[in-house]
Amino acid sequence: MAIQHRDPRGGGGSRDARTNRRIKAREVRVIGAEGEQLGVLPIDQALARAQELGMDLVEVSPMAKPPVCKIMDYGRFKYLEKKKQNEAKKKQVVVQLKEVKLRPRTEEHDYDTKIKKVRAFLGEANKARITVMFRGREMSHRELGQKVLQRVIEDLRDVAVIESAPRMEGRQMFMILAPNPKMLQSQRDKAKAAAAAAPAAAPAAGAPAPAPAPAAPAPAPTAADPAAQR
C-alpha cells in the first residue's frame, strides 16, 4: 500500500484534519501509534514511518510550530468517533412540555383525570404546563385560578417542583412544573434493584430442554428381604 494513494477523508469537508499528502508543512513533530514521541521529522520521513505501519499521518495540531502529527488508522478513528456521537445521542433525554388546561371551577372528576395524566407525564421525566383559562367575568376572580394552581401544587408535591411560578398571560394563569429530582432518583434506584434481582435468563426459544436427571438405582435386595427369598 502506498501512502500517497490513501485519503481516508474521501475528499471530505474542511472539518477533517489534514492527512498524509495533504499536510503542507515541510517538517512536523511526530507522535507514534502508541503515543511515543518521535521528534521533529521531515514530512517525507514522517510519511514513510506511517507507511511502514500501514497507517496514516494525521495533523492533530496544525497551529503548533512545527505542526504536530500523529500516526494512526484515521479511517478507524473516524468510525469510532462517529460511533461515540451516535451513542451519546441515544443517551440524551428529550424533555417534553405537556399542557393541561383547567377552569376556575373545574369539575372534580375532570380535575382528577387531568392530575393523573400530569403525574404520569412527570414520572416520565417530562415537564407540565398547568393553565387556568378565564372567560368573561371570571377575569375579576383571579383568586379562583390561584386556588386551583395551589391545589395542583399540593396534589403533586411528591412528584413535582415548581419551575415557573404562577403568572397571568392574557386570559390565562399558568405555571410550569418539573419532575421532582428525588422522585426520579427513586425510580432509578428501583430500576437498578429490579435489574439486580432479576432471575437468570430463560433458555432461548427453540433451545432443547435440559435432559432430566437419571433416576437413582433401586437398592439391591438383602437376604432378609422376603422378595429375595422368593
UniProtKB/Swiss-Prot annotation:
Low complexity: compositionally biased ranges: 193-208, 221-230
Keyword list, A-Z: Cytoplasm, Initiation factor, Protein biosynthesis
Disordered: region residues: 1-21, 184-230
Example GO biological process: ribosome disassembly
Signal sequence bounds: none
Biased composition range(s): Pro residues: 209-220
SUPFAM superfamilies: Translation initiation factor IF3, C-terminal domain, Translation initiation factor IF3, N-terminal domain
KW Cytoplasm (keyword) present: yes
Compartments (UniProt record): Cytoplasm
Keyword Cytoplasm among record annotations: yes
Principal subcellular localisation of the protein: cytoplasm
InterPro entries: T_IF-3_C_sf, T_IF-3_N_sf, Translation_initiation_fac_3, Translation_initiation_fac_3_C, Translation_initiation_fac_3_N
Function field: IF-3 binds to the 30S ribosomal subunit and shifts the equilibrium between 70S ribosomes and their 50S and 30S subunits in favor of the free subunits, thus enhancing the availability of 30S subunits on which protein synthesis initiation begins.
Similarity annotation: Belongs to the IF-3 family.
Subunit structure comment from the entry: Monomer.
Name of the protein in question: Translation initiation factor IF-3
The organism's taxonomic lineage, starting at the top: Bacteria, Pseudomonadati, Myxococcota, Myxococcia, Myxococcales
